[in-house]
């Protein structure tokens, strides 16, 4: 079983989604998990303990294991991610330029089949629409929306 498959099976078996897996040159494994209700420290601890056990049993070599939430600027990789975060502000970088640019920032529209829509500000300030598929994307991330005003 491949490392990604092993980790994804373990993470989903615990009720979480594997967002991303990074393996650094120094033997560090970084695992990013999520669920609709968000991720707590207890969630990270639970997944860490289970993965430590599984990686030991499977004799997978690593120096350090880090499990965390994907953060406010989480990557969007699967069609389900684009569905879940429809209506959110995102940044999308395409593999090939379209109309002379590769990076777009705008409001995500829910996928229609395999096609994903992004409403962005066009050249003359008017609203424009970009339609793309997962195959067109180099990377896509949520744009963090942070409100520092106090809630009174």
UniProtKB/Swiss-Prot annotation:
Its main location: cytoplasm. Belongs to the RimP family. The keyword Hydrolase does not apply. CDD domains: YlxS_C. Required for maturation of 30S ribosomal subunits. It is found in: Cytoplasm. InterPro entries: Ribosome_maturation_RimP, RimP_C, RimP_C_sf, RimP_N, RimP_N_sf. Pfam families: DUF150_C (PF17384), RimP_N (PF02576). It comes from Burkholderia cenocepacia (strain ATCC BAA-245 / DSM 16553 / LMG 16656 / NCTC 13227 / J2315 / CF5610). It comes from the Bacteria. One of its GO terms (biological process) is translation. Keywords: Cytoplasm, Ribosome biogenesis. GO terms for cellular component: cytosol. This is Ribosome maturation factor RimP.
């Amino acid at each position: 079983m491949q490392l990604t498959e092993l980790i994804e099976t373990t993470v989903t078996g615990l009720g979480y989604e594997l967002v991303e897996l990074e393996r650094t040159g120094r033997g560090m494994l970084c695992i990013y998990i999520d669920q609709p209700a968000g991720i707590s420290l207890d969630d990270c601890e639970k997944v860490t303990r289970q993965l430590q056990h599984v990686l030991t049993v499977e004799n997978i070599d690593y120096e350090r294991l880090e499990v965390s939430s994907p953060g406010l600027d989480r990557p969007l990789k699967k069609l389900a991610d684009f569905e879940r975060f429809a209506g959110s502000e995102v940044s999308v970088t395409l593999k090939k330029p379209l109309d002379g640019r590769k990076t777009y920032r705008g409001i995500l529209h829910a996928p229609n089949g395999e096609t994903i829509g992004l409403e962005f500000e066009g050249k003359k300030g008017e609203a424009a629409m970009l339609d793309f598929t997962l195959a067109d994307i180099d990377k896509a991330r949520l744009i963090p929306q942070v409100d520092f005003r106090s809630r009174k």
